[in-house]
Amino acid sequence: MAQPGSGCKATTRCLEGTAPPAMAQSDAEALAGALDKDEGRASPCTPSTPSVCSPPSAASSVPSAGKNICSSCGLEILDRYLLKVNNLIWHVRCLECSVCRTSLRQQNSCYIKNKEIYCKMDYFSRFGTKCARCGRQIYASDWVRRARGNAYHLACFACFSCKRQLSTGEEFGLVEEKVLCRIHYDTMIENLKRAAENGNGLTLEGAVPSEQDSQPKPAKRARTSFTAEQLQVMQAQFAQDNNPDAQTLQKLADMTGLSRRVIQVWFQNCRARHKKHTPQHPVPPSGAPPTRLPSALSDDIHYSPFSSPERARMVTLHGYIESQVQCGQVHCRLPYTAPPVHLKADLDGPLSSRGEKVILFQY
């Protein structure tokens, strides 16, 4: 994938310094091969071909300018190994990413931009291709769509209004980095024309249909109307049975030509109206025992006098009561007056509603 700017991908290579080689030739070749491995074809620049630079010998007449100077710290490299990237050399410990400061001595590639060293992650996060819709990075393995120099993820190339993903060969409009399908692009043009005719100032961004505008509005439910014959049939049935069963509903549907659901709803509405206009009578709770007294106190109730043939048994008795007492073989008459015993009348008794006080006598 092409990289923006003039950044080039370079390979790092470990080179021998002033000391004689103590490594086996196969090990050196394996290390050089590992360091020269290229990661993908993302760089437009051809990686630099590493070359082995031998340090100047003591008998050589090469000036001191030929010394191996580290590009990072500026000191002479006297170590046994050094790293070389695009004809620039570093100490093994000095080659690191300029952003995250991660050492690149174990990496087989790095990236240079404006004389700055970057690791792969930081280079692509700063200079890599990004999606014009979501702003995230586009990797080399991602499928993309391009429009007017912008790159989009395949899923991000969708209409801004209806969120529908556009397919290959489909017409679309691009308005201020917003992708519109043909339908909503024409809607935007109509909004601009209507605003111009009415003299209203409408910006281009305001003319773009929003996501709420693209959603279809729910249609209003059509009200059901009944003919006089249909109402007559249903009202006659309601007078007989206000809650018909499924079989009766089917018969009414066949007679009126309406659906069972419509007839069922009509009966539900009629029952609700009938219940609303019918006076409600209070019903005593089923768990409470019946009582003969109202909720008011008994002292506040005025009673009517009680007259009954048996009243004589319940009044005070005076005088003598004849009683036979057996005294041996002699029968005699003794005067006897029974002491009164006052008892409270039971509220639930038959006399509680008469207000009489009962006086009983013992014999």
Curated annotation (Swiss-Prot):
Compositionally skewed regions (Pro residues) per UniProt: 281-292
UniProt keyword annotations, A-Z: Developmental protein, Differentiation, DNA-binding, Homeobox, LIM domain, Metal-binding, Neurogenesis, Nucleus, Repeat, Transcription, Transcription regulation, Zinc
Location of the region described as Required for interaction with LDB1 in the Swiss-Prot/TrEMBL record: 55-194
Biased composition (Low complexity): 42-65
Gene Ontology molecular-function annotations: DNA binding; DNA-binding transcription factor activity; DNA-binding transcription factor activity, RNA polymerase II-specific; metal ion binding
Keyword Chloroplast among UniProt keywords: no
Cystine connections: none
GO biological process: cerebral cortex GABAergic interneuron migration; cerebral cortex neuron differentiation; cerebral cortex radially oriented cell migration; cerebral cortex tangential migration; forebrain neuron development; forebrain neuron fate commitment; neuron maturation; neuron migration
Membrane recorded as keyword: no
Superkingdom: Eukaryota
Organs and tissues of expression: Brain specific. Expressed by neurons in the amygdala that are activated by reproductive olfactory stimuli and project in regions of the hypothalamus involved in reproduction (at protein level).
DNA-binding region: 219-278
Record-linked InterPro entries: HD, Homeobox_CS, Homeodomain-like_sf, LIM_Homeobox_TF, Znf_LIM
Phenotype seen when the gene is deleted: Mice lacking Lhx6 fail to thrive, develop general weakness and die within the first 2 weeks after birth.
GO cellular component terms given for this protein: nucleus
Residue stretches making up the LIM zinc-binding domain: 70-122, 131-184
Subcellular location: Nucleus
Region span, Disordered: 19-65, 203-224, 274-300
Function: Probable transcription factor required for the expression of a subset of genes involved in interneurons migration and development. Functions in the specification of cortical interneuron subtypes and in the migration of GABAergic interneuron precursors from the subpallium to the cerebral cortex.
Quaternary structure, from the entry: Interacts with LDB1 (via the LIM zinc-binding domains).
Protein name: LIM/homeobox protein Lhx6
Organism: Mus musculus (Mouse)
Taxonomic lineage: Eukaryota, Metazoa, Chordata, Craniata, Vertebrata
